[in-house]
């Protein structure tokens, strides 16, 4: 049967929904948020059949409000990433208000279709949402079980029994978005459908994504990160969910970027000031070819490229002048004679020498540093150039390459500088990573995100304060997040036990409202399993008895596992009529032989 409508009716309903959506955009919840689309574009993609996402919407609304309260009070949530649904429920029951779900644990865990592996986001787009769905389902079940048990308590029992908040306040790992706008939208849609209210998106390049504390990270330009954040917000608006978007940057420890197109990234591009040096790409490929020609056939990356003989000759001559070819020959001879060390390790040693030698001979630096060096020389010679090195440094910190070059021309300064010479064989540009770059990346993302996160190489309050102060100088109400990573060796951070204890509290004072141990649950799971397995081998069933004693001592709900997982709720439908106020029928008083609940004299802990 066809649905009949009139053009007037359709237009009226559409116009009303556009107006309502614009009103939603203008809500104080989104103060300072920029959307690169209109309310009309959102409504055009909603269709006519209403679809509601109650769990995600309500959780997002309440979670955001709570984070705002914490920000205003200079406090924070300190949490970790659970490795199982039981851990997620335990987190909430122990008073930790929010949960982190990271791709690290998802990678390490594997699935029915994916092998366990490192944190490279090499799993399907659906895998983290699938992991999140299990956590959300566990939290909702815990809430139902709690409600059922409390309804069957006396008033005195309810007063003596705390009620826990099992709302799924979760921020989940959206990695790089797994591709373009459509991939980001698909990923956010999956998170919303299963009830997740928060998502973090990072500025690494898909396909080369690394764990935040691994080397070799390749960034995308600032405009690409903004596109991801904007696509996420667009999908949330279509679904009418005020989700919490976290913009993560890896710029503090990254050294590569896949494009120089965005002006905000250009102050951090590295280039050669010795324009006669062979390109880094040519030197690297010549090094690989040298190993290959000496019989190390495992190294053959140069065969991917079509570098000309002239470039190879120039690069090989440079390697020879640096003494690197002689080192290659000695390394290969030693490897062929004993083979005790892997060829990858040996190549890495030579590669490090190549990198250090090339950077030194190339005079690798940013364009701003190249001009500043000339200004300092002129100043030392008593020349009046028109701008001091300090003034230039302040100007060039956020200037595009075009603007910087134009200003240098005005000053009569023209350093030889070429960032193309420093490109890697893959075509990536080298950059000057660090806190200043992370600040620049985050300032660009701030109008499109609810929370900013700078991934760091170690735990350092001074670095955190520098970042927070720079962000809040321009965005005073911007909430921040901090990774309390297990990848750090916290005993080598230089902090005392008391300083480590107060670390999350101090972060809260700076505006870091969501602070998390990414894969803490993975380590808890492993250590607990190792300890119990060891005890079981040594002490037999005494190991279990000791565990049960501990559960009874701390009144853990794990001492009654059937009740914990909802046994009473599961049996309700069979043992009494639907209306709990109605007088039970005689048969309802008889416990069936198939009941999952224990008999009165059973000594089990159910």
Swiss-Prot record:
<keyword id="KW-0329">Glyoxylate bypass</keyword>
<dbReference type="GO" id="GO:0006099">
    <property type="term" value="P:tricarboxylic acid cycle"/>
</dbReference>
<dbReference type="InterPro" id="IPR015813">
    <property type="entry name" value="Pyrv/PenolPyrv_kinase-like_dom"/>
</dbReference>
<feature type="binding site">
    <location>
        <begin position="102"/>
        <end position="104"/>
    </location>
    <ligand>
        <name>substrate</name>
    </ligand>
</feature>
<comment type="pathway">
    <text>Carbohydrate metabolism; glyoxylate cycle; (S)-malate from isocitrate: step 1/2.</text>
</comment>
<dbReference type="InterPro" id="IPR039556">
    <property type="entry name" value="ICL/PEPM"/>
</dbReference>
<feature type="binding site">
    <location>
        <begin position="212"/>
        <end position="213"/>
    </location>
    <ligand>
        <name>substrate</name>
    </ligand>
</feature>
<comment type="subunit">
    <text>Homotetramer.</text>
</comment>
<feature type="active site" description="Proton acceptor">
    <location>
        <position position="211"/>
    </location>
</feature>
<dbReference type="InterPro" id="IPR018523">
    <property type="entry name" value="Isocitrate_lyase_ph_CS"/>
</dbReference>
<keyword id="KW-0479">Metal-binding</keyword>
<dbReference type="InterPro" id="IPR040442">
    <property type="entry name" value="Pyrv_kinase-like_dom_sf"/>
</dbReference>
<dbReference type="InterPro" id="IPR006254">
    <property type="entry name" value="Isocitrate_lyase"/>
</dbReference>
<protein>
    <recommendedName>
        <fullName>Isocitrate lyase</fullName>
        <ecNumber>4.1.3.1</ecNumber>
    </recommendedName>
</protein>
<comment type="function">
    <text>Involved in the persistence and virulence of Mycobacterium. Catalyzes the reversible formation of succinate and glyoxylate from isocitrate, a key step of the glyoxylate cycle, which operates as an anaplerotic route for replenishing the tricarboxylic acid cycle during growth on fatty acid substrates.</text>
</comment>
<dbReference type="GO" id="GO:0004451">
    <property type="term" value="F:isocitrate lyase activity"/>
</dbReference>
<keyword id="KW-0460">Magnesium</keyword>
<dbReference type="GO" id="GO:0006097">
    <property type="term" value="P:glyoxylate cycle"/>
</dbReference>
<dbReference type="Pfam" id="PF00463">
    <property type="entry name" value="ICL"/>
</dbReference>
<feature type="binding site">
    <location>
        <position position="518"/>
    </location>
    <ligand>
        <name>substrate</name>
    </ligand>
</feature>
<feature type="binding site">
    <location>
        <begin position="483"/>
        <end position="487"/>
    </location>
    <ligand>
        <name>substrate</name>
    </ligand>
</feature>
<dbReference type="GO" id="GO:0046872">
    <property type="term" value="F:metal ion binding"/>
</dbReference>
<keyword id="KW-0456">Lyase</keyword>
<feature type="binding site">
    <location>
        <position position="173"/>
    </location>
    <ligand>
        <name>Mg(2+)</name>
    </ligand>
</feature>
<keyword id="KW-0816">Tricarboxylic acid cycle</keyword>
<feature type="binding site">
    <location>
        <position position="248"/>
    </location>
    <ligand>
        <name>substrate</name>
    </ligand>
</feature>
<comment type="similarity">
    <text>Belongs to the isocitrate lyase/PEP mutase superfamily. Isocitrate lyase family.</text>
</comment>
């Amino acid at each position: 049967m066809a649905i009949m409508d009139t053009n007037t009716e359709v237009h009226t309903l559409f116009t009303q929904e556009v107006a309502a959506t614009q009103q939603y955009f203008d809500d104080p919840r989104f103060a300072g948020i920029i959307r690169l689309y209109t309310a009309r574009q959102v409504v055009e993609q909603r269709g006519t059949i209403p679809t509601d996402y109650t769990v995600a919407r309500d959780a997002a609304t309440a979670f955001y409000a709570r984070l705002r309260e914490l920000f205003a009070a200079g406090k924070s949530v300190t949490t970790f990433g659970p490795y199982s649904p039981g851990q997620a429920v335990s987190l909430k029951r122990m008073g930790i208000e929010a949960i982190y779900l990271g791709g690290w644990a998802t990678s390490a865990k594997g699935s029915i279709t994916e092998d366990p592996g490192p944190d490279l986001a090499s799993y399907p787009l659906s895998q983290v949402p699938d992991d999140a769905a299990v956590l959300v389902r566990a939290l909702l079940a815990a809430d139902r079980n709690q409600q059922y048990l409390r309804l069957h308590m006396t008033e005195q029992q309810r007063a003596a029994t705390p009620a826990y908040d099992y709302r799924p306040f979760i921020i989940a790992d959206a990695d790089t978005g797994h591709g373009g706008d459509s991939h980001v939208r698909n990923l956010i849609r999956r998170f919303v459908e299963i009830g997740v209210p928060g998502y973090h998106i990072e500025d690494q390049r898909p396909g080369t994504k690394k764990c935040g504390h691994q080397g070799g990270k390749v960034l995308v330009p600032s405009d690409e990160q903004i596109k991801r954040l904007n696509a996420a917000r667009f999908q949330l608006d279509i679904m009418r969910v005020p989700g919490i978007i976290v913009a993560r940057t890896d710029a503090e420890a990254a050294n590569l970027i896949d494009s120089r197109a965005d002006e905000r990234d250009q102050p951090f591009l590295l280039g050669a000031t010795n324009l006669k040096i062979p390109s880094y790409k040519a030197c690297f490929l010549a090094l690989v070819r040298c190993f290959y020609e000496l019989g190390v056939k495992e190294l053959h990356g140069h065969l991917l490229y079509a570098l000309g003989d002239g470039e190879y000759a120039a690069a090989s001559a440079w390697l020879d002048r640096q003494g690197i070819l002689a080192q290659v020959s000695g390394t290969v001879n030693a490897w062929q004679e004993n083979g005790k060390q892997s060829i990858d390790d040996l190549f890495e040693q030579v590669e490090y020498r190549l990198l250090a030698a090339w950077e030194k001979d190339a005079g690798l630096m940013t364009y701003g540093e190249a001009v500043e060096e000339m200004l300092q020389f002129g100043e030392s010679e008593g020349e009046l150039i028109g701008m001091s090195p300090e003034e230039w440094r302040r100007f060039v910190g956020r200037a595009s390459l075009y603007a910087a070059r134009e200003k240098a021309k005005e000053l009569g300064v023209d350093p030889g500088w070429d960032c193309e010479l420093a490109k890697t064989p893959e075509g990536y540009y080298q950059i000057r990573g660090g806190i200043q770059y992370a600040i620049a990346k985050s300032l660009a993302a701030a109008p499109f995100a609810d929370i900013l996160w700078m991934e760091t190489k170690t735990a350092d309050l001074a670095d955190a304060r520098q970042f927070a102060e720079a962000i809040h100088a321009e965005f005073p109400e911007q909430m921040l997040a901090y990774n309390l990573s297990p990848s750090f060796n916290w005993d080598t951070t230089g902090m005392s036990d008391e300083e480590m204890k107060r670390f999350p509290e101090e972060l809260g004072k700076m505006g870091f409202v969501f602070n998390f141990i990414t894969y803490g649950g993975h380590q808890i799971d492993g250590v607990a399993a190792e300890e119990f397995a060891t005890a079981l081998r040594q002490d037999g069933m005494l190991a279990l008895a000791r565990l049960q004693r501990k559960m009874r001592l701390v009144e853990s709900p794990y001492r009654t596992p059937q009740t914990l997982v909802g046994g009473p709720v599961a049996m309700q439908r069979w043992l009494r009529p639907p209306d709990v106020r109605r007088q039970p029928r005689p048969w309802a008083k008889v416990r069936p032989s198939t009941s999952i609940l224990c008999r009165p004299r059973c000594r089990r802990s159910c």
